[in-house]
Amino acid sequence: MLSLLAASLAADPIYWTDLGLRPGIDLGFFTLRYYSLAYLIGVIFAYWHTSKMLKQPGAPMAQRHADDLFFYCTLGVILGGRLGYAAFYTGGATGIPSAFTDFSGDGFVSWRLLRLWDGGMSFHGGLLGVTAAMFYVAWRDKLNFIRVVDYVCVGVPMGMLLGRLANFVNGELWGRASDMPWAMVFPGADDLARHPSQLYQAGLEGLALLVILLLLFWKTRARYRPGLLAGVFTLGMGISRFVNEFFRQPDAQLADFAARTGLSMGQWLTLPLILTGLIVVLFALRKPPLASGTTAPA
């Protein structure tokens, strides 16, 4: 039955296995996973680009603040992403314990939660973790929180771009069944040709949003309007993820939830992002811009 449906959807689909992709680089003593490498390169790029932006007039913080900030942000994205996935996306069904329901016999969360190499990271959890890290550093060093977010968020889409490309290389998080010419058959996807939704996400929330934010920072005076860059990032990320969820196959353990509510878990979690981003952008545009000579604590 499934094979007949696959044949009707795509007469000559692309087979992911024919691409010769591997999940990592074999270094002999261990395999460097592309997903881990994507996180590493994303953090390095964001740090490098933020340091470059801080050399421009009107920066909200000094380099020493950025050094501390990216240490805490790295912890925030890893811990927040993992805890967010366990809390919102598992229900204990994938080997990653739910932070709310799957406790060990002695009352503590299972150590399986720490097995990052098994996969499972939530964008929304990572976003909350990074936001908490930025808030802590801004509060501790008496920095303008929203302007710190403005600068940090510009480089974030690079990490999203690389992360989604890594998902594609791993053959995971594929999309819904499709008859488009570029539809692909992924391992474990019931031999159905599907949308390569990882590439859609890489293009929308990665490349497109990165270009928009870079142009706003380097070619306009957006950085002198506190909250504008942060709002555009939040709004753009929310819209990109909401749209892409229509092409992405819902998580198996949440398929019933999506069927009952009409939207996926990712879309429900994204709606507050869209609303928040829109409000922040409107407020940023209503206020007069800062003077070019505005400086931050050294």
Features from the language model and the residues they span:
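Hydrophobic, membrane-interfacing alpha helices
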Residues: 2-298
